[in-house]
Design a protein with these regions (language model features):
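Hinge/lid segment of periplasmic solute-binding proteins
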Residues: 96-146, 172, 277, 281-283, ...
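Conserved N-terminal structural module of periplasmic/extracytoplasmic solute-binding proteins
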Residues: 4-10, 16, 31-102, 161, ...
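Periplasmic solute-binding protein
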Residues: 101-108, 125-161, 190-211, 296-304, ...
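Glycine-centered hinge/linker elements that transmit conformational signals in sensory
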Residues: 175-176, 214-242
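A structural signal for short loop-to-beta-strand junctions that line the ligand-binding cleft
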Residues: 83, 90-91, 118-153, 185-187, ...
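Short helix-initiation/N-cap motifs at beta->coil->alpha
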Residues: 70-79, 98, 166-172, 240-254, ...
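Long, aromatic- and glycine/proline-rich binding clefts that accommodate carbohydrate-like moieties
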Residues: 33, 332-385, 393
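Extracytoplasmic/periplasmic substrate-recognition and gating elements
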Residues: 33, 62-66, 157, 231-238, ...
Length: 418
C-alpha cells in the first residue's frame, strides 16, 4: 500500500516511488487491480499501511488487488465533497457520521444492500448509515468518551482515583485536590468545544434536538452543564488546552500537568508514543444531575464510490478492512473499538492491561446512560459552531453564561432555519 498526499509538489518522484513499491510488492502477480482509498491525513496513512502489511495484505495480493491511500489533509469533508463533485473521488473513502447525510445526498455513494452482509455489525452503527432503507457505509470502528487519568498525580494528591461511582460533585472535589498540588498543575483539561463538552450536557438531561428538529441552548439542563464546566475552569481546577500550549486534552494529559482528560481509545496510541512512562487508568464518565452519565458515539464508515470502475474490487477491500482479523488488530493497537458485534466480548478486554481496561470502558460507555451519536443531521458540523463560540467566550471569561448562550441560541435558530 502506498500513501500519497494531495499536492503537486514532488509528483514525479512520488509516482516513481509508488510504481517501484507496487512492482516490488506484487512482483509475483500477473495483474493487479488498483483501488484508491481516500481517508484522513495525520496518523491514518501509517495505520492503514500497517494494517495491510501485518493483517490483510497477503490475502489481497493473492487476489491481485493493490491499494493506494490518498490522505485528504486539512478539512477532510470539504476535500471529499470537492472530489465527489469533480468526479475525482477514490473508489473507497471514509464517511464520518457527522457529515454522512450530506455526503450521501450527493448521490455518489453506492448503496450496499445485497452487496455486503451487514448482520455481523452493531445495529446502532448500521442504522447511523441507513437512509430511506439503504445502507451506505460500514462502520470501521467506533469510540465513546472515557475519563483517562494520571495515576501519579492522584497518588501525590492523596485522593482516590476517579471511578464509576463519581457524581459531578465527587468528581469535581477530586479535580480540586489535584489542582492544589501546584500552580501549574490542574485537575482536568476541558476542551471549549461540543466534541467533549456535549457529554456533560447529555449527563444533565439535555437532548440535542427535539421532535421538531429544534435545538434549545437555553434549556436549564444545558445551562447547568455550561455553568458547571465553566466554574471548574474559573476556579483553576481545570484548564483549557491552549493555556498550557496544547491543542487537545490528550496532549494535556501527556504533559504531566493535568490529572484527567476526556478521550476515546484513540488517545492510547498517542500516550504510548508521547508519554510512554505515564501511569494511567480509565473509568466511566461521571454521573450528572439527570442521574445518568452522558456520552457520545464517534464513528467513521467505509463507503464505495457509486461511479467506481472497480466496484467489485472496492467492495472486496471494504470487506477485508472490516474483517474480524482487521478489527482485532485495530483493537489491540488501542486505536478504536470494533464495529462487529461478535467482538464485543473479545478476551482482549479482560487482559488487565491499562490499554485493555480503557478499551473496555470505552466500549461499555457506548450504551451507558444518555448517549447520542456525534451527528447533526443535514446541518452537519456547522451545528456545533454556535455552541463552540459560546464555550470559548464563557471559558475565557469574555462573556457570561447567560449572554453567551442567548447569542448562541440566535445563531442556532438562524442556522436551522436555512
Amino acid at each position: 500500500l502506498t500513501a500519497i498526499p494531495h499536492s503537486e509538489e514532488g509528483e514525479t518522484v512520488r509516482k516513481a516511488i509508488v510504481t517501484a513499491l507496487l512492482l516490488a510488492l506484487f512482483a509475483g502477480t500477473a495483474w493487479a487491480q488498483n483501488i484508491r482509498i481516500m481517508g484522513y491525513g495525520g496518523n491514518d496513512p501509517a495505520i492503514v499501511v500497517r494494517l495491510l502489511e501485518e493483517v490483510i495484505g497477503d490475502e489481497l495480493e493473492a487476489e491481485g488487488i493493490t491499494l493506494t491511500y490518498e490522505p485528504l489533509e486539512g478539512d477532510y469533508n470539504a476535500a471529499l465533497f470537492n472530489a465527489l463533485s469533480a468526479g475525482t473521488a477514490a473508489d473507497l473513502f471514509y464517511i464520518p457520521v457527522e457529515t454522512a447525510p450530506g455526503i450521501i445526498a450527493t448521490g455518489k455513494v453506492l448503496p450496499l444492500n445485497g452487496l455486503v452482509d451487514v448482520d455481523p455489525f452493531i445495529d446502532s452503527l448500521v442504522e447511523a448509515y441507513t437512509f430511506d432503507g439503504q445502507v451506505y457505509g460500514i462502520a470501521k470502528d467506533f469510540n465513546s468518551l472515557a475519563v483517562v487519568y494520571n495515576k501519579d498525580l492522584f497518588d501525590e494528591a492523596g485522593v482516590a482515583y476517579p471511578d464509576e461511582n463519581d457524581t459531578w460533585e465527587t468528581f469535581a472535589d477530586k479535580l480540586r485536590a489535584v489542582s492544589a498540588l501546584d500552580d501549574d498543575v490542574y485537575g482536568a483539561c476541558f476542551q471549549p468545544a461540543y466534541d467533549r463538552f456535549g457529554a456533560f450536557a447529555l449527563a444533565a438531561g439535555w437532548q440535542p434536538f427535539d421532535a421538531d428538529g429544534h435545538t434549545d441552548l437555553l434549556d436549564p439542563a444545558f445551562v447547568e452543564a455550561v455553568e458547571w464546566y465553566a466554574s471548574l475552569v474559573q476556579e483553576g481546577a481545570a484548564v483549557l488546552p491552549a493555556d498550557i500550549g496544547q491543542g487537545w486534552t490528550g496532549g494535556c494529559l501527556a504533559t504531566d500537568q493535568v490529572g484527567v482528560a476526556f478521550e476515546g481509545a484513540w488517545v492510547l496510541g498517542f500516550l504510548r508514543d508521547e508519554a510512554p512512562n505515564l501511569q494511567y487508568g480509565a473509568t466511566f464518565m461521571p454521573v450528572g444531575p439527570s442521574g445518568q452519565r452522558g456520552n457520545m458515539l464517534y464513528t467513521v464508515a467505509w463507503g464505495v464510490n457509486a461511479d467506481s470502475p472497480n466496484r467489485d474490487a472496492a467492495i472486496r477491500v471494504l470487506e477485508a478492512l472490516t474483517s474480524p482479523e482487521a478489527q482485532q488488530w485495530v483493537l489491540e493497537q488501542g486505536l478504536a473499538i470494533p464495529s462487529r458485534e461478535a467482538l464485543a466480548d473479545n478476551p482482549f478486554f479482560d487482559t488487565g492491561t491499562p490499554d485493555a481496561e480503557a478499551n473496555r470502558v470505552v466500549f461499555q460507555g457506548a450504551s451507558d446512560g444518555n448517549v447520542a451519536p456525534f451527528a447533526f443531521g443535514t446541518v452537519g458540523t456547522a451545528w456545533m459552531n454556535p455552541i463552540n463560540d459560546a464555550l470559548v467566550a464563557v471559558l475565557s471569561g469574555q462573556a457570561s453564561v447567560g449572554d453567551a448562550l442567548a447569542n448562541a441560541q440566535r445563531e442556532m435558530d438562524t442556522l436551522l432555519q436555512r
